[in-house]
From Swiss-Prot:
SUPFAM superfamilies: Influenza virus matrix protein M1 (SSF48145). Most abundant protein in virion. When expressed alone can form virus-like particles in transfected cells. One of its GO terms (cellular component) is virion membrane. Plays critical roles in virus replication, from virus entry and uncoating to assembly and budding of the virus particle. M1 binding to ribonucleocapsids (RNPs) in nucleus seems to inhibit viral transcription. Interaction of viral NEP with M1-RNP is thought to promote nuclear export of the complex, which is targeted to the virion assembly site at the apical plasma membrane in polarized epithelial cells. Interactions with NA and HA may bring M1, a non-raft-associated protein, into lipid rafts. Forms a continuous shell on the inner side of the lipid bilayer in virion, where it binds the RNP. This is Matrix protein 1. The lineage of its organism: Viruses, Riboviria, Orthornavirae, Negarnaviricota, Polyploviricotina. Residues 1-164 are annotated as: Membrane-binding. It comes from Influenza A virus (strain A/Duck/Hong Kong/2986.1/2000 H5N1 genotype C).
C-alpha cells in the first residue's frame, strides 16, 4: 500500500458515511494526484462543509496544507488553528512539545506513527497545530504518520461507540437504529438508481421503505416491528443491481 493510499484510508475512516464522504474522498484523490492545486479554494470549501466536527476539519486542513504546493506567505486558516489547539489545555501543549521532539528524530512514516500512538488525541492534535503554525518542522512523511495515528485513535473510539450501540439490548434503541439504517439504505438506492427507466422499480421500493419508516415513527410501533426491514431493502437493492448488471458487495 502506498503512503498516500494509507493516509487516505485513515482520514476517510473518521468521516461519517454519506454523500459528503464521497465528495471528500474525491477531493483527497485529486489532491494526492496533483490535480487540485488551489489550496485557498480547497480550504474555503472545507470550512463551509456541514456535519464534520472541528477536529475532522482541522485534520483535513492539515493534510491539504501538507500536500498542496502553496506560496510561502499563504496565511494559516483560523478554523484549522482552533481545531488543533488541544482544547486550549496546557497539558496537551506540554505533551505535544515532547512528542514533537521525538518526531524530529524519526524519518519514516511508520516510525512516527508508532511513536505518536502512545499519546492522547488532544496531544496529537496540539502537535499537528505546532507544525501547522510553522512553530516546528518535520518531514511530510513524519507529519502523515502523526495524522494517521490521530485518525486511528478517533476511529477506535468511534468503533467502540458503534459496537456499544450494535450490541445494546435496549429494544427501543435497536428499533430506532434499524429504522435509521433502512432510511439511509433507501437513500442510497435512490442515488444509485439515477434516471434510467429500470430505476423506477428501485425508486418505488425505496419510497415505500421511507413511507413505512415515517409511519412507524409517527404512530409509534412495537420495537420488533422493524426487524428485517433493512434486510428486505438490501435484497431488493441486490436484485435491482443484478438486473442492471452492477455488482456491489452487500453493504451490511
Amino acid at each position: 500500500m502506498s503512503l498516500l493510499t494509507e493516509v487516505e484510508t485513515y482520514v476517510l475512516s473518521i468521516i461519517p458515511s454519506g454523500p459528503l464522504k464521497a465528495e471528500i474522498a474525491q477531493r483527497l484523490e485529486d489532491v494526492f494526484a496533483g490535480k487540485n492545486t488551489d489550496l485557498e479554494a480547497l480550504m474555503e470549501w472545507l470550512k463551509t462543509r456541514p456535519i464534520l466536527s472541528p477536529l475532522t476539519k482541522g485534520i483535513l486542513g492539515f493534510v491539504f496544507t501538507l500536500t498542496v504546493p502553496s506560496e510561502r506567505g499563504l496565511q494559516r486558516r483560523r478554523f484549522v488553528q482552533n481545531a488543533l489547539n488541544g482544547n486550549g489545555d496546557p497539558n496537551n501543549m506540554d505533551r505535544a512539545v515532547k512528542l514533537y521532539k521525538k518526531l524530529k528524530r524519526e524519518i519514516t512514516f511508520h516510525g512516527a506513527k508508532e511513536v505518536a500512538l502512545s499519546y492522547s488525541t488532544g496531544a496529537l492534535a496540539s502537535c499537528m497545530g505546532l507544525i501547522y503554525n510553522r512553530m516546528g518542522t518535520v518531514t511530510t512523511e513524519v507529519a502523515f504518520g502523526l495524522v494517521c495515528a490521530t485518525c486511528e485513535q478517533i476511529a477506535d473510539s468511534q468503533h467502540r461507540s458503534h459496537r456499544q450501540m450494535a450490541t445494546t439490548t435496549n429494544p427501543l434503541i435497536r428499533h430506532e437504529n434499524r429504522m435509521v439504517l433502512a432510511s439511509t439504505t433507501a437513500k442510497a438506492m435512490e442515488q444509485m438508481a439515477g434516471s434510467s427507466e429500470q430505476a423506477a422499480e428501485a425508486m418505488e421500493v425505496a419510497n415505500q421503505a421511507r413511507q413505512m419508516v415515517q409511519a412507524m415513527r409517527t404512530i409509534g410501533t412495537h420495537p420488533n416491528s422493524s426487524a428485517g426491514l433493512r434486510d428486505n431493502l438490501l435484497e431488493n437493492l441486490q436484485a435491482y443491481q443484478k438486473r442492471m448488471g452492477v455488482q456491489m458487495q452487500r453493504f451490511k
